[in-house]
A protein has these predicted regions:
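Compositionally biased terminal segments of proteins
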Residues: 1-209
């Protein structure tokens, strides 16, 4: 059996062409799906300023609403790829990613570069559900926010919850910057969530201090 991985898209290095949140919001203007910017960009949107360079642009959307995002991006001429287990498999227009994982990368053929990483999540328009285990949930209105310009983003306590898994250098920097600024309710929630999914995580004591 061959161990060759299938990679239909451009090199990963072309994520240097990723859209900014402003560009993503312009592309998705009028789409009713409850999407939101995720990852490090979401923290910067919450802060109201860019604090560091970002390697890509991630958005999240409940799985049931993914076809709306797909239709808009394909309508703009982008090609979508199901990405999982080191593979990037090109999707036909309107083709669902199926069981190929939760990540779909959007590439613009005109520049042969990646523009956006779309996470298909559980939950619905009213409820956010933690994708990795399903053990945690919260009202979507509490788990997200909007900039003054109307760009939706994942709330910082949710972003940090996902960043806690690997705790790369940039994740630790983000935590040190964001955690002291969280409201008490958000800090307490994040600490409690970590006790459930990652007991003993070094951030728990820092959040409780």
């Amino acid at each position: 059996m061959s161990d060759t991985k299938r990679w239909d898209g451009p090199p990963v290095e072309t994520w240097s062409m990723a859209w900014t949140p402003d560009q993503a919001a312009e592309a998705l203007e009028g789409v009713a799906a409850p999407w939101a910017v995720a990852g490090g960009w979401a923290l910067d949107l919450w802060l109201g300023k860019q604090t560091r360079k970002h390697e890509d642009l991630e958005i999240t959307v409940p799985r049931a609403f993914f076809p709306e995002i797909q239709a808009r991006l394909e309508g703009l001429g982008l090609q979508l790829f199901a990405v999982d287990d080191g593979q990037a498999i090109a999707l036909e227009p309107g083709e669902a990613p199926g069981r190929r994982g939760f990540q779909t990368w959007a590439m613009e053929p005109a520049v042969n570069g990646w523009r956006m990483d779309v996470f298909s999540e559980p939950g619905d328009a009213q409820t956010w559900i933690y994708r990795r285990t399903g053990e945690l949930s919260a009202p979507r209105a509490w788990a997200s926010g909007r900039t003054p310009a109307g760009i939706p983003y994942v709330a910082p306590q949710i972003v940090l919850l996902f960043k806690a898994k690997a705790t790369r250098d940039k994740d630790q920097v983000d935590f040190a910057l964001i955690a002291p600024k969280l409201l008490p309710e958000a800090r307490d929630w994040l600490a409690a969530a970590l006790r459930i999914i990652q007991p003993g995580h070094l951030w728990i004591d820092q959040l409780s201090a």
